[in-house]
Amino acid sequence: MALRGVAGRVSAGVPPAHLASAAVEPPSGLQHRLVHGDQEAVVTEVGATLRAYTVGGRPAILGFDVTEHATHARGQLLLPWPGRVGNGRYRWQGVDYQLPLDEEELTNAIHGLVRWSNWTAETPSANRVVMRYRLHPRDGYPFCLDLVASFELADAGLRATLSGTNLSGVPAPFGAGVHPYLAVDGERVDGWRLAVPAETRLRTDSRMLPIGRAPVAGTEFDFREPRVIGSTQLDTAYTDLVCDPDGLTRVSLEAPDGRRLVLWTDSGCPWLVLFSADPLPSDERRRGLAVEPMTCPPDAFRSGEDLIALQPGETATLSWGIDVTGFRP
């Protein structure tokens, strides 16, 4: 359900004080509310962003208010690349390209080109919405992509897909990712129990660019067996993921009271980035854990590692979701 005010567009659940000023456009545009049983989610026009997700009225993600815009990539889609591109420069099929540097302090391009674009909703229903955006050629990325994101609430939780189709006449470099922050309670991540089935992590330099791989065994980054996060600061890319028998990789997060969230992803995402939200403002610092499924590692436009050469007419798709079965009382 997409909600509009008398002279503007507002979200479901907006307090009456905001409704009185309905002419004020939400910074994230039209709000698409999904409902299924005790679950509610909001996907925004700007960026096809997952702004909110609650179960029984309790937040399952660290989202943001309808009066705000997404900061620190909260709930955003990362296309046509996730993570950073060092100096914003890359070479593709013998041609050098320069991307906009939107992480100026580290001189990087970061998290793609569509986070602030207006996406169009197609055939929305009570519990599902499909968002579409046509990425046209531009300086630094002269390729045309048809991008589609679906969000659906089901009994077990949120199910989502993300795909890109190359509408250009030449191969296009392509990667994809998503950036939800899980939140199992209103406290800091320090007391949460985390399990990440990954054997390897990326080491990074001072600009957060990869400089090599390292085994997680015996380090503070080893969460192959569930353990409390404690004071560990995470801004870490993991790979060599271990799948369950059904082919899915699952990251679990459990609060001290036993409530548990599980983020799952399919084999289309051989990478996960975990980020403990340390740079966020003091009232939000470490109150959510970003678990980011990605088709390729950071800086893949330069390294080529797991970068998809999307052929003309070809589609690449990833699936992911949040299982809330253990989140209810």
Where are these regions (language model features)?
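Short, Gly/Pro- and small/polar-rich lid/capping loops
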Residues: 2-37
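Active-site/ligand-binding surface loops and adjacent short beta/alpha elements
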Residues: 4-9, 13-18, 99, 181-267
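Extended, loop-rich substrate-binding clefts of extracytoplasmic carbohydrate-active enzymes
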Residues: 9, 101-155
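Acidic/His-leaning functional-site neighborhoods
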Residues: 39, 108-122, 193, 226-303
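Acidic-aromatic substrate-binding/catalytic surfaces of carbohydrate-active enzymes
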Residues: 40-98, 102
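Short Pro-Gly-centered flexible turn/kink motifs
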Residues: 90-98, 162, 309-326
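A short, structured loop/turn motif at beta-sheet edges
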Residues: 91-95, 121-129, 152-157, 186, ...
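Acidic, contiguous internal or C-terminal segments within carbohydrate-active enzymes
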Residues: 133-185
